[in-house]
């Protein structure tokens, strides 16, 4: 039987301390203001913000950002944009994360926009997805449109951009904190700029905002001689713990982490290194525990099409990429569900992902799931679990590298911090 432990006051440790600190800060601020009413205007001029710009300290109920897991009732979400999406240059880290049959595509179109007609269809699909989310009672927010074709240069590399299609890759909400991930692809170095207006708004309304150490993305971060030839090579390398990213500096994509209350699960992948995982462990302890899990996966990148937690003690586990630690979950009383084989046809382009985007679903709450309208077999699987399916077709959007979970970051879910993994 699954054991659940509710933590009083919501998020214990870090968030409780934050709230107590806020109350103490207010009291101290009041005393100081009374003591300094006669102070000079020159001292006031040294304040970093004017009176109308002061950032408020919210109560837990007022904070616009709060999510503890992947299944509590969804109230607000960021949905990405396909507009202006560009093919990333064919660098070593891109090669390691893509399938060989698409390498000629990257070699030909790297630095250019994705096929225009395909992107237009993806844009229309995501707009419809947003409309359906709003119909389901969810507030939808979007990143800013950006011209990703512009070339940029740092002291260590030059590149063009990619897109702001997958907010799950760059933003992770833990409690009332937004964490910006230090992603590993050079083409995504400035992706955060599309989200900054939203993040600043949430911050001004009381959310906590953390940017993980920005990687230099110097050559030392990548194994320039990473030996990629066949899928068998990839299996061997992954089994040996060898990846295209080194331990030169911390890097991670937020989509390699998945939340279950006080327990957060992560994989070491082509874009997430152990330094990045350790940074998250130190940053989130002691309230949260980070568990490293691994899979029989020749191309590990993002956990949510391999291991997707859809409810308290309920997880979808990809049969093609079995979890090496699955007994750990069974012993904790979890139910492990094997999703059916995807139905997406072989001739549909998936430039950055596999067909298993069928299991990359978005839970609207414990009893509602957003699922691909074309994937009838997984719809039946959810219905057998007593979960209502909200069907949307995003096949052309899938081609850009993500399913519903990838295309979103949940900003606010109604619930409390609990332990599901005792």
UniProtKB/Swiss-Prot annotation:
GO terms for molecular function: glycine amidinotransferase activity. It catalyses: L-arginine + glycine = guanidinoacetate + L-ornithine. CDD domains: amidinotransferase_AGAT-like. It is found in: Mitochondrion inner membrane. The active site is at 253, 302, 406 (amidino-cysteine intermediate). Signal peptide: none annotated. The keyword Repeat does not apply. Its main location: mitochondrion. Its EC number is 2.1.4.1. Strongly expressed in neurons and glia of the brain, the lamina propria, submucosa and serosa of the small intestine, in oocytes and on the fringes of the pancreas. Not expressed in the retina, eye lens, heart or bulbus arteriosus. Expressed in the yolk syncytial layer in gastrula stage embryos, in the yolk syncytial layer and mature somites in early segmentation embryos and in the yolk syncytial layer and the liver of long-pec stage (48 hours post-fertilization) embryos. Homodimer. Belongs to the amidinotransferase family. PANTHER family: GLYCINE AMIDINOTRANSFERASE, MITOCHONDRIAL. This is Glycine amidinotransferase, mitochondrial. It comes from Danio rerio.
């Amino acid at each position: 039987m699954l054991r659940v432990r509710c933590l009083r006051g919501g998020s214990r440790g870090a968030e409780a301390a934050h709230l107590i600190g806020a109350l103490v800060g207010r009291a101290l601020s009041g005393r100081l203001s009374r003591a300094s009413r006669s102070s000079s205007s020159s001292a006031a001029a040294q304040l970093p913000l004017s009176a109308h710009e002061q950032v408020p300290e919210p109560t837990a109920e007022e904070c616009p950002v709060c999510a503890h897991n992947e299944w509590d009732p969804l109230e607000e979400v960021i949905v990405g944009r396909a507009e202006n999406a560009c093919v990333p240059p064919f660098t070593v880290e891109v090669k390691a994360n893509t399938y060989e049959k698409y390498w000629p595509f990257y070699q030909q179109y790297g630095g250019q926009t994705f096929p225009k007609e395909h992107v237009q269809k993806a844009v229309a699909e995501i707009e419809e997805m947003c409309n359906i989310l709003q119909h389901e009672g969810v507030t939808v927010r979007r990143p800013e449109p950006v011209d990703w074709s512009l070339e940029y240069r740092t002291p260590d590399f030059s590149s063009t951009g990619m897109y702001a299609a997958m907010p799950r890759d760059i933003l992770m909400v833990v409690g009332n904190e937004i964490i910006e991930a230090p992603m590993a692809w050079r083409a995504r170095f400035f992706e955060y700029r599309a989200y900054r207006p939203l993040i600043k708004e949430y911050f001004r309304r009381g959310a906590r905002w953390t940017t993980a150490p920005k990687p230099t993305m110097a050559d030392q971060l990548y194994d320039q001689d990473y030996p990629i030839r066949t899928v068998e090579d990839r299996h061997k390398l992954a089994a040996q713990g060898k990846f295209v990213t080194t331990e030169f500096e911390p890097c991670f994509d937020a989509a390699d982490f998945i939340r279950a209350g006080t327990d957060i699960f992560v994989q070491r992948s082509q874009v997430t290194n152990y330094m990045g995982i350790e940074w998250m462990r130190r940053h989130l302890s002691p309230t949260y525990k980070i568990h490293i899990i691994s899979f029989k996966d020749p191309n590990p990148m993002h956990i949510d099409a391999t291991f997707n937690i859809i409810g308290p003690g309920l997880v979808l586990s990809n049969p093609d990429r079995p979890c090496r630690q699955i007994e750990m979950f069974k012993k904790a009383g979890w139910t492990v569900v094997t999703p059916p084989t995807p139905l997406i046809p072989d001739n549909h382009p998936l430039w950055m992902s596999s067909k298993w985007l069928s299991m990359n679903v978005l839970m609207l709450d414990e009893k509602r799931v957003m699922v691909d309208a074309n994937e009838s077999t997984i719809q039946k699987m959810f219905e057998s679990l007593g979960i209502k399916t909200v069907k949307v077709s995003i096949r052309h959007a899938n081609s850009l590298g993500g399913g519903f979970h990838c295309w979103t970051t949940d900003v606010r879910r109604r619930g409390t911090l609990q332990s599901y993994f005792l």
